[in-house]
Amino acid sequence: MPRRRVIGQRKILPDPKFGSELLAKFVNILMVDGKKSTAEAIVYSALETLAQRSGKNELEAFEVALDNVRPTVEVKSRRVGGSTYQVPVEVRPVRRNALAMRWIVEAARKRGDKSMALRLANELTDAADNKGTAVKKREDVHRMAEANKAFAHYRW
């Protein structure tokens, strides 16, 4: 690690349709092989479907879905005296968003629906209703942290 200075986070340009940095990050996570316009088309189509189902505007519905997947605690491995402990630590806000988005995209890719836009829309709808694979993933992470609460004093 460099000792001189801390390098700041890169600024992400907000997405052209809604002007949201969060949505731009989501598009970047979904993007494969640098095909951003394809990723944008998929996300916008999914958000349109989500908005029709939920009755809210696209950005609001996306925020609700993302909020239900964001983890508050996770476990990190810590080696102490020859044995490894899973130590629960709080998740930083930037990482919360990144994990939530990654989990939603992974869950959508594993679904068996026809198009990616439909898979993503279904996963976001499930996330907004507090069900689905991405929400289950968050619950599993929280359960792991709760189970290993005894090792919280090993935090660094």
UniProtKB/Swiss-Prot annotation:
The entry's family comment says: Belongs to the universal ribosomal protein uS7 family.
Q: Which of UniProt's keywords are assigned here?
A: Ribonucleoprotein, Ribosomal protein, RNA-binding, rRNA-binding, tRNA-binding
Q: Which Gene3D superfamilies match?
A: Ribosomal protein S7 domain
Q: From the Swiss-Prot or TrEMBL record, give the protein name.
A: Small ribosomal subunit protein uS7
PANTHER family in the record: RIBOSOMAL PROTEIN S7
Q: Name one GO cellular component term.
A: small ribosomal subunit
Origin: domain of life: Bacteria
The record describes its quaternary structure and partners as: Part of the 30S ribosomal subunit. Contacts proteins S9 and S11.
Which GO terms are recorded in the biological process aspect for this UniProt protein? translation
> Which InterPro entries does the record cross-reference, listed alphabetically?
Ribosomal_uS7, Ribosomal_uS7_bac/org-type, Ribosomal_uS7_CS, Ribosomal_uS7_dom, Ribosomal_uS7_dom_sf
Q: Name one GO molecular function term.
A: structural constituent of ribosome
Q: What does this protein do?
A: One of the primary rRNA binding proteins, it binds directly to 16S rRNA where it nucleates assembly of the head domain of the 30S subunit. Is located at the subunit interface close to the decoding center, probably blocks exit of the E-site tRNA.
The protein's matches in Pfam families, at most eight in alphabetical order, are given as:
Ribosomal_S7
Q: Which organism is it from?
A: Klebsiella pneumoniae (strain 342)
